[in-house]
Amino acid sequence: YHEWFDRRRDPDGDDLVSIIHPWESGWDASPRWDAPMHLHHPSVHETHAARDAHMQILHAYGHDAQKLAADGYFCVESVEFNAIRVADLQALARIAAILNQPAGVWTSRAAAITAAIQQKFITPGGIFDLSGPDETPIQVPSSAPFILLFGACIDPATAAALVQQLKSDRFWPTYPVPTTPTDHPAFVGDHYWRGNVWMSVNWLIYTGLRTMGYTAAARELAYRRLDLVEQHGFYEYFNPITGHGNGPAQQSWTAVVLDMIATAQ
């Protein structure tokens, strides 16, 4: 699996893998993807139509990341995708140790990706995804950088700065953590991926806070999640200001709130 990523999704050999469709990130219609998808202030319908149309492009290009990037199509080195990959490699190393198998191959890959994350994603101006062969920063704020905590792939100073940003009003409204900050022009609390609370994203941030030692912030986030579900029910995603649930009711992944509460004690 990881060899496939290295072979097929790292055309420039910099240890950061690329995604070639917004769906691969899970953040389907995030404002982060507007520019690389050649969208300008899109409607919900326009983002949906663009994602569907992009599938035809992928088929035409044989899902070749290098060719897609060269011709200006969506090919993005995603902050949280690479952070999650580091966490996965670290988990494989722990499994290998339990099985008395060599863990070095996993730890060395995790270390290489961590170094690339720190060198390329983290800049004085912010932490941004990189688009295309020129690695153009996508300067759209989001909660994706907080998932670097989950990968434990940042130094303590960067972690402290991220937590300070996380606890700001724009990311810590009545029901944190929105995918797009509440003061951003693209924020729409009830529109799909334009600034909602997603339990899956919040679980990654919560786990990252615990991993990096920010247990008080993690506990507060867990109990705010419980409050959200108690007041507004189980839904796919929520408005961070009103708590209004959107998408399918009884969405299964919202049950991660149980893990958050169980481990926040």
Model-derived segments and spans:
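Extended, well-ordered alpha-helical scaffold segments
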Residues: 1-5, 88, 92, 99-118, ...
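Aromatic- and glycine-enriched pocket-lining scaffold segments that form the walls
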Residues: 1-7, 22-23, 76-92, 96
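Charged, solvent-exposed alpha-helical segments that act as regulatory interaction surfaces
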Residues: 7-14, 98
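Extended glycan-interaction surfaces of carbohydrate-active proteins
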Residues: 11-77, 112-197, 230-265
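Amphipathic, non-membrane alpha-helical segments in soluble helical-bundle scaffolds
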Residues: 75-83, 103, 107, 195
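Peripheral, non-catalytic segments that deliver or gate enzyme domains
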Residues: 78, 190-214
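Well-ordered alpha-helical scaffold segments within catalytic/enzyme domains
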Residues: 83-101, 147-157, 203-215, 257-265
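Short amphipathic alpha-helical segments
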Residues: 200-204, 217-224, 233, 253
